[in-house]
Swiss-Prot record:
Residues that bear Phosphoserine: 195
Region (Disordered): 1-83, 130-167
Organism in which the protein naturally occurs: Arabidopsis thaliana (Mouse-ear cress)
Record field: compositional bias (Acidic residues): 12-29
Biased composition (Low complexity): 144-160
PROSITE patterns: BETA_AMYLASE_1 (PS00506)
Compositionally biased residues, Basic and acidic residues: 30-39, 71-80
Name under which the protein is recorded: Beta-amylase 7
Keyword Transmembrane helix: no
Source organism phylogeny: Eukaryota, Viridiplantae, Streptophyta, Embryophyta, Tracheophyta
Catalytic activity of the protein: Hydrolysis of (1->4)-alpha-D-glucosidic linkages in polysaccharides so as to remove successive maltose units from the non-reducing ends of the chains
Localization: Cytoplasm
Biased composition (Polar residues): 41-59, 132-143
Gene name of the record: BAM7
Protein family (similarity comment): Belongs to the glycosyl hydrolase 14 family.
Length: 691
């Protein structure tokens, strides 16, 4: 089944020091052989790497006339870099198989497993010792060492596929701090999956000498040799043609503060101007948050929709569509938040006397970003349960703005299910000190969720399980530094499986109950739920960051199918927040965090498609350049899909003044046309690099 592939993880970063020590001598001899080979023939990726190492020996040896052999510690570090580079290639191969195939591979598959799986898929027989021969339908078993030759040639063929095209190598200085040094070194080891768009022409020589600017170079491998940067600039590649692909409607997310705290349009004239520009480039519509803290901000069941009515009328007059988000969370404190919109004032008053209405971590820190799911059925909000509060809010929207629903101006209603409107626990709060790529913490220590856990433990007959795990580290821990998330840790023991099943089921039950109410309210209108892209630590066994966020998705279990089935049950669309573009826009070390945004995305999308759930997407970080847009297109347009699967819509984040600038709006218009499946003329720009 396709879901088997969801568990295909890349190999973990297991730096076995003893093994590497044994390899140092052999690989040093290999350096010399490869230097000779590089001088003779030149251009394989392995030769380039060895050539770089020879340069490092020359530059790094004081006096210049000494031995080229580096100190043992440096050789060991070089060996580690080679190993990480090899594992990154393996992870990309696994990612491709996960995306396009259905192969029965073990969790920690290596390249031999990949070759064997491909051979078996092609009808060959592969024995446990690696002996490979055709099946009876293909021919007779070869004799002697021919199978080894076949296996070797297969490996050689796959390795040849990894060989990169010739690239310009530029050496310059300019590192200014150890942090920058580390950042560039890691970029030389791990790069995102190669694509026709993993490149960025260098427009000025200053880029070569500036690490801050070089961090934005896409697809350019940045290696470091004793305070020297080596930039490998891939050759120019033709952009993909998306003409004739299925039409994907494009929505632009409006500014978070488009409606002020008085429920009025903050800048009517400026907004109208921008909406007209969006209409002129054939954007389908806009997406807007309907903030609980604004509409029901002062008193229970007193709703003010005035500003939203004005906004919807303006959008309708321009013949645009609207996607609305029922935002039952606060705004402010998260990445990209530029305004502060708290929960309703009367809710905050209840929280001051009963802070257990908020999610709580093991240290007792409360998070007022949204209400705990433990009070969904607790009648503590001025005589109402949380579910009743959400239902009344949605019903008020349905009554007051019915005309926009009935005439189709509102094309989708997304139901906020947690922090940032996403279905997840607030496991990574910046306000409590979390920083990427920490594993986060479980958020189940308010008295209402604690009561639910106790009840679940009693029903299992193990009352001593009525507690959260005590060996999960802290917000910024890494999996291997904890007893719970490490390989073979407690997460996979009897108690761990019980706790994680309960923790994730609370999330699913919350979604199930609210979506049931939403379907009652909005009836025939399209509803949706948003899922985040929790990609860090995906290539470890435990998937720690996903576990704390409420997705029970370790390497031996599929945590997204049950969620997709719940959405399917209520006819809801799965709106997925895409994280792939972060590889381009952020200097985060994806290799060190063992993150794989594309793999997470494909697992979630396949879970949705397998259940028959429609999929919409939105980007998580702003992007105004062609390289970023092309990367997004790769993740939202499925050109080679035999079933012609496509998104129900794409929401672009977000409408800001920079988007409206001349060159940026031209690039965005190209992006919109490609999402619509229209032909786009390629205008080639010539860039000159001075070395």
């Amino acid at each position: 089944m396709a879901t088997d592939m969801h568990k295909l993880l890349g190999t973990s970063e297991e730096d076995d020091d003893e093994e590497m020590d044994m390899d140092v001598k052999e690989e040093d001899d290999g350096d010399r052989r490869n230097r000779d080979k590089h001088a003779a023939s030149g251009s394989s990726s392995n030769d380039e790497f060895m050539f770089q190492q020879s340069m490092q020996d020359q530059v790094g040896t004081p006096g210049g006339g000494g031995s080229r052999r580096s100190r043992p510690l440096e050789e060991k570090e070089r060996t580690k870099l080679r190993e990480r580079h090899r594992r990154a290639i393996t992870a990309r191969i696994l990612g491709g198989l996960r995306r396009h195939g259905n192969y029965n591979l073990r969790v920690r598959a290596d390249i031999n497993d990949v070759i064997a799986a491909l051979a078996r898929e092609a009808g060959w027989v592969v024995l446990p010792d690696g002996t490979t021969f055709p099946s009876k339908s293909q021919g007779t078993k070869p004799t002697g060492g021919s199978s080894a030759v076949a296996a070797g040639s297969s490996a050689s063929h796959i390795a040849s596929q990894q060989t990169s095209p010739p690239a310009l190598r530029v050496v310059s200085s300019g590192l200014r701090s150890p942090v920058e040094l580390s950042s560039c070194r890691m970029k030389g080891v791990f790069t995102p999956a190669p694509s026709p768009y993993d490149m960025l022409p260098i427009q000025s020589p200053e880029l070569v000498g500036s690490v801050n600017k070089a961090e934005g170079l896409v697809g350019c491998s940045v290696d470091v040799i004793n305070s020297k940067q080596i930039l490998e600039i891939p050759p120019n590649l033709t952009e993909q043609d998306f003409s004739g692909t299925p039409y994907v409607p494009v929505y632009v997310m409006l500014p978070l503060g488009v409606i002020n705290m008085k429920c009025e349009l903050a800048d009517r004239d400026g907004l109208l101007k921008h909406l007209r520009i969006l209409k002129s480039i054939h954007v389908d519509g806009v997406k807007v948050d309907c903030w609980w803290g604004i509409v029901e901000g002062h008193s229970p069941q007193e709703y003010n929709w005035t500003g939203y009515r004005q906004l919807f009328q303006m959008v309708r007059d321009l013949n645009l569509k609207i996607q609305v988000l029922m935002s039952f969370h606060e705004c402010g404190g998260n990445v990209g938040d530029d305004v502060c919109i708290p929960l309703p004032h009367w809710v905050a008053e209840i929280g001051r006397t009963n802070p257990d209405i908020y999610f709580t971590d093991r240290e007792g820190r409360r998070n007022p970003e949204c209400l705990s799911w433990g009070i969904d059925k607790e009648r503590i909000l001025r005589g109402r349960t949380a579910l009743e509060v959400y239902f009344d809010y949605m019903r008020s929207f349905r009554i007051e703005l019915a005309e926009f629903l009935e005439d189709g101006v509102i094309s989708m209603v997304e139901i906020g299910l947690g922090p940032c409107g996403e279905l997840r626990y607030p496991s990574c709060p910046i306000k409590h000190g979390w920083r990427y790529p920490g594993v986060g913490e479980f958020q189940c220590y308010d008295k209402y969720l604690s009561k639910s856990l106790r009840k679940a433990a009693e029903s299992r007959g193990h009352l001593f399980w009525a507690r959260g795990p005590d060996n999960t580290g802290s917000y910024n821990s890494q999996p291997q530094g904890t007893g719970f998330f490490c390989d073979g840790g407690d997460y996979d023991g009897l108690y761990g499986r019980f706790f994680l099943k309960w923790y994730s089921q609370v999330l699913i039950d919350h979604a199930d109950q609210i979506l049931c109410l939403a379907k009652l309210v909005f009836d025939s209108s399209c509803i949706a739920a948003k899922l985040p892209d929790v990609h860090w630590w995906y290539r470890t066994a435990s998937h720690a960051a996903e576990l704390t966020a409420g997705f029970y998705n370790p390497s031996n279990r599929d945590g997204y199918s049950a969620i997709a089935s719940t959405l399917k049950k209520h006819g809801a669309t799965l709106s997925f927040v895409s994280g792939e573009v972060q590889v381009l826009n952020r200097p985060d070390d994806f290799s060190g965090a063992l993150g794989e945004p594309e793999a997470v995305a494909w697992q979630v999308l396949n879970a949705a498609w397998d259940s028959g759930t429609p999929v919409a997407r939105e980007n998580s970080l702003a992007c105004h350049d062609r390289v970023g847009y092309n990367k997004m297109l790769e993740s939202v347009k499925f050109r080679n899909d035999p079933d012609r699967k496509h998104l129900s819509s794409f929401a672009y984040s977000r409408l800001v003044p920079a988007l409206m600038e001349g060159h940026n709006i031209v690039e965005f218009e190209r992006f919109v046309k490609k999402l619509h499946g229209e032909a786009v003329m390629n205008h080639h720009h010539h860039h000159h690099q001075q070395v």
